Amino acid sequence: MSRRRKHDDSPSPKKTPHKTVAAEECGSVVEPGRRRLRSARGSWPCGAREGPPGPVRQREQPPTAALCSKSNPEERYETPKRALKMDSLSSSFSSPNDPDGQNDIFWDQNSPLTKQLGKGRKKQIYTTDSDEISHIVNRIAPQDEKPTTNSMLDMWIGETAIPCTPSVAKGKSRAKISCTKLKTQSQEEELMKLAKQFDKNMEELDVIQEQNKRNYDFTQMISETEILSNYKDNIQMWSLHNIVPEIDNATKKPIKGNTKISVANNQNSSQKPFDQIAEAAFNAIFDGSTQKCSGQLSQELPEAFWSTSNTTFVKTNALKEEKIITNETLVIEKLSNKTPRSLSSQVDTPIMTKSCVTSCTKEPETSNKYIDAFTTSDFEDDWENLLGSEPFAMQNIDMPELFPSKTAHVTDQKEICTFNSKTVKNTSRANTSPDARLGDSKVLQDLSSKTYDRELIDAEYRFSPNSNKSNKLSTGNKMKFENSSNKIVIQDEIQNCIVTSNLTKIKEDILTNSTEASERKSALNTRYSNEQKNKCILNQSIKAPVNTDLFGSANLGSKTSVSNPNQTSASKVGSFFDDWNDPSFANEIIKACHQLDNTWEADDVDDDLLYQACDDIERLTQQQDIRKDSKTSESICEINNNSEHGAKLTQQQDIRKDSKTSESICEINNNSEHGAKNMFAISKQGSNLVQSKHLNPGSISVQTSLTNSSQIDKPMKMEKGEMYGNSPRFLGATNLTMYSKISNCQINNLHVSYTNTDVPIQVNSSKLVLPGSSSLNVTSDHMNTEITTYKKKLSTNQPCHKTVTDEAQSNLNTTVGFSKFTFTRMKNSQILSQFNQNCITGSMSDTKITQGVEKKKGVNPLLEEAVGQQSLVKLSESLKQSSKEEEEKNRKCSPEEIQRKRQEALVRRMAKARASSVNAAPTSFL
């Protein structure tokens, strides 16, 4: 290309056009001579060396062009200057197929000129029309340059082919091939040698395995005889397991004797397959995690390692080795594995007695599960189950110590549990992280399903051992089941001091299935007759100006925060480093684990089953609500506002009604396929389903005395959101709060009636039915995330301030107002501001049953349209009315509240977008 630029820039082609014309005329005649010159191209490299340099030849171009204008063609054609020029142009190109070389070779004055344009473009300038296509073709692609053969392959294949490799090279390549053959043959021989050696090693290992089996049989025989001689060494263990000491010795001592004798025999044997020290080190490494998780091992730990190392191929011996490790953590495992009769007696004895939950009621079944895992997997450690079994021991450490045992059998169990507490205390600090116990709910789910039917038989005392397990079952299903209450009954007569002082422990123990709570609650309920067994566990008093928790039992996934002045900091998760002797410390750890494990498993099948179960319950409750709605309203009218005794009678009647209805619905759903898994667990006392899908109709009366300064604050904070279908229900942390704030009304004896409690409410994918609301002359509002009928509107996260007016009759001393039901998710300050503006008595009715409004004195201006409706109002009409009331409220809101609402809407929108991404993620994640 540099030569071409020189020619382009040279003055010879551009000086005068007549020289170019003359050259063209010569080109039309001199074709034979030009071909002859091209045929001599084989000598171009030599000519290039002999010829003068390029600039000299360029200076010689004008005479050549001048000769073309003369009439002497032969001299023109045979002049060597022309040939030297052509040779010099092709001197730097060795390949005839090089396009750049061809362009440089065939360049002459007759070719079209190329004018350099900007940016690398070239423009051809055709000077004359005398050029023919054949001339151009002959110049560019002459025929004599074609190869003599028919195809390019003949240049390399055939007799006249160019030799690619000399004969010497071929000989060398053959020698190399022979070398490689020899190498491959030697490799095959080496592989055969290795295979033979491997076979020998395998045979030796088989022989060693047989010897190990013989040694094991021999040591087992000697260990059985050694039990009697070493009986004194096991006195301490026997005192801890004084129920069945022979079984304890039978499981512990054979391994002890086996370790001693097997080590001696293997050391004396002629063939040692493995390094004993190395094997002991490896076993120590692999058994280390089990030691850390399951507790401190016995004093024979090095011998146990030696036993495992010397019986590597003996799976039965290893199985017994694992049983020792498990027996250190779950001592009852020995009893359940060896004596099923003693196991059944341990399970049945606490049920027959009046004692509450003992540690043995859960541990035998847990140990059965793990023994089955060991026997079926053949020395495959189920690490997750070993980790999951730790919360059993942690939870059961302090339970028997909270109350005296009723029988000697329970005393034995108490001692065993004490042994577990000593074992676990040293290592449980390392296991306080909630992640270590996430497998607890999965294990408990199976255990509680086995003991679920035992609750129905167990109707003579308040808290059965299985009721605690059924509470744990709710953790696996992401629901908290209240097992011994049919409705929330607030009674002002029940020991205000006791309930106030113990409110923190009661709330906390409900969430953590503590036995202390059950003991205290049963003690509070023993003063009532057997007919009143169905009353709520939380017999709370709201007579004192103390903030109590109406939702006493929230979901395990939700944190029920109770604002109590006497409440300690025991409910804070940050107290992980407290004293282990504190009974509530283990409960706090388990509660933290449950809070982390409160989301559904990423399984669409469970969600579908839950939704189907919810639909079935809705159908059943709608049929029963229609029948009993009128009875409920009549029971409200019969309550005497000034009579405290009348309120008690009404409470008893309503509770009896509710218990009958709830038992019927619970039995129906308990027989269903999905009821046992996803819905709720009941206790045979006519236990209420506070956290279950539905509460039956009825009225619950509360006779309370409130002063002007008292305020009932009932917050429930939902920790984690739950996905219901594709729409988010609870996102982030939302306060589910029920406020009953007293305005400027001096009331000393205020009658509160809870009516029409048939409103299923969605809380963390489990429908929660709250009792209606208070018929007070004060602001009463129930904040609910979702009522089942309003799924569509609430699932889209619209800022709902819907009100549903229903039938309410109140005989208050001062004023009479009408109730409204709001479905909101607002901040507390916003609610209080609305409450201060509008002092409305609240009551909640069934959403799908027609609702009526009776007109009375002191009608609130916000409810004028609703008051005018004397007839029954359908759900759609009530929704329209609620939207109108919402618009009226929004008009009266201040700009600050409007701005706050906008911010909340923005937060909900962001939460919805985040939830949609989270909802789309499990499909790919699964």
UniProtKB/Swiss-Prot annotation:
Residues that bear Phosphoserine: S186, S464, S833
Compartments, record wording: Nucleus
Free-text description of this protein's post-translational modifications in UniProt: Phosphorylated by ATR.
Outcome of swapping W107A: Reduced interaction with ATR
Signal peptide feature range: none
Chief location of this protein within or outside the cell: nucleus
GO molecular function annotations of the record: protein serine/threonine kinase activator activity
Cross-link Glycyl lysine isopeptide (Lys-Gly) (interchain with G-Cter in SUMO2), where in sequence: K85, K414, K442, K480, K507, K533, K535
Name recorded for this polypeptide: Ewing's tumor-associated antigen 1
